[in-house]
Amino acid sequence: MGRLFVYDENMTDERAKITVAKMAAVSDIVASEKAFIQYSAAGQLTVLAGAVIAVGDAIFQTEETTLSAANLDGASSFAHGKDYYIYLCNNGKDSSNEVYLISENSTFPDGVEWDDTNTRKIGGFHYGFVRNVDEYGREVNTSGSVRGSGWESNVREDIAPNSVWTALHRPKCDPSGMAYLGNGLWADIYLASDDGANGLQSVYNATPITGTEGLNWYIANEKAARVGKRLPDLAEWLIAAEGSPQGLDGSNTNGWTATTNTARTAVGKIKNAISVKNIMDIAGNVWEWINELCLDPTAASWNWYNVMSGYGQIYMPSQTALHALIGGGNWGDGVRCGSRAVVCDHCPWNVSTSVGVRCVCDSL
């Protein structure tokens, strides 16, 4: 390791010279507001002024700027269910201010002039369904009444405001397909699906992973950990679920819940099936493992039970006494599905085709 800067009042030592390249080398992103990119209107974001960002060997200070589909690197409009990434680009001209591009590419924008040396990913967002809420974040109908007539369908297609992230305001894991719940916690917008690498992902229109793929509570935790996520506890899950409509016996209008359904379905397809935190399918489709355990209060035969062959034994008051909570409801549970629906009788080693998982992650 060598010295990058030294003191030399005569400036004969190159290390004494302060250059843009040197400043860029020691700079990261400095901003008074971590969330320096924010949702501002339908289909629009605002970059706040004053953030200092190094891009390659250049340094920019942001001016207040509105971003929209006009900043896309290819298409003319945002596509439903897609994750987008925001790039600050250096076109190499000292006379030019920063250039912003929005791309579906997670490495650098499309265009022969752009690569990882002259662009920097500074944020992103998800585009999909958004539940309309009042100033307190409560579910309302089109007249503004909390849970007033027709509130369930008061949903629009837009940038999910709480999915907007920056390099400073984001989860510790990959932020794709996630939304901010508050208090330093992010949640998957969609039920988890197999990422093809023995982990989990939050992706629109995917098939939710369940016991059909061998999932139980233990395996759900392991797969979540591989991608830097975890299972929510009950309080966290309830926050994510708030404002998602109760299921219906005879219809899939408010979620994949009709009692005539026979199997899970692709995630994110039902417009009304969304919470005030813009979390999809949390009531219906498949139950969700929760990081909350309890014991059967009626059991009294304490002993070692070999319920997980090859993984050790559990000392508990019966062979099925240890339970892990599941929440939300499944495809055929009808009115039993909802934002506070919980079942307390599933053993964590159970492999059920109707139980999946949704992950959360703490803020960086």
Question: What spans do the regions from the language model cover?
Answer:
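Cytochrome P450 core scaffold surrounding the K-helix E-X-X-R motif
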Residues: A197-N198, I290-Y305
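Acidic glycine-/aspartate-rich tracts in secreted/extracellular proteins
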Residues: N90-S96, L191-D194, S244-P245, E292-L295, ...
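Glycine-rich, flexible loop motifs
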Residues: I18-G81, G92
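Disulfide-stabilized, aromatic/cysteine-rich ligand-recognition loop
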Residues: E213-L215, Y311-L364
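Short aromatic-cysteine micro-motif
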Residues: N132, Y136-M280
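Elongated alpha-helical scaffolds
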Residues: F78-L101
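Residues within well-ordered beta-strands of beta-sheet-rich folds
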Residues: Y85-C89, W186-D188, K277-N278, R358-D362
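Short, low-complexity N-terminal tether/leader segments at secretion or assembly junctions of large
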Residues: M1-T19, W114-D134, R138
